[in-house]
Regions:
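Basic, Lys/Arg-enriched alpha-helical interface segments
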Residues: 1-71, 80-84, 91-112
Length: 112
């Protein structure tokens, strides 16, 4: 699991790894253009510092909305008190599908 952490962080951010070792979030991130990738990195830094003001919760899944471009979303869950587990990424056009995928991944993670 890759970990992104700044000094004095409130949360430790980790990526969910599938059985084959791949990271759904990482694969999505690598396909972003440079501007979108920077926006996502800034959002992750804010999340790490405890700023979850742009988050809506759906069935235990957090959706961090980036108000820019296509409406980028980061889907995650809190695992324990201080770990944020990145499950997926997407945009407004795939929002419903992305939420269902994130919920399924979170369920599989919790009960495996």
């Amino acid at each position: 699991m890759d970990t992104y952490m700044l000094p004095f962080s409130m949360f430790s951010i980790k990526e969910l790894l599938l059985e084959d070792g791949s990271s759904p979030f990482g694969n999505w991130f690598l396909k972003l253009d440079t501007q979108a990738a920077v926006k996502v990195q800034v959002a992750l830094a804010r999340m790490e510092q405890g700023n979850l003001s742009n988050v809506k919760w759906f069935r235990g899944i957090g959706e961090y909305k980036i108000n820019w471009g296509p409406g980028i979303r980061i889907y995650f869950a809190k695992d324990g008190l201080n770990i944020i587990l990145l499950l997926a990424g997407g945009d407004k056009s795939s929002q419903q599908k992305d939420i269902e995928i994130a919920v399924s991944r979170w369920h599989d993670y919790k009960f495996s």
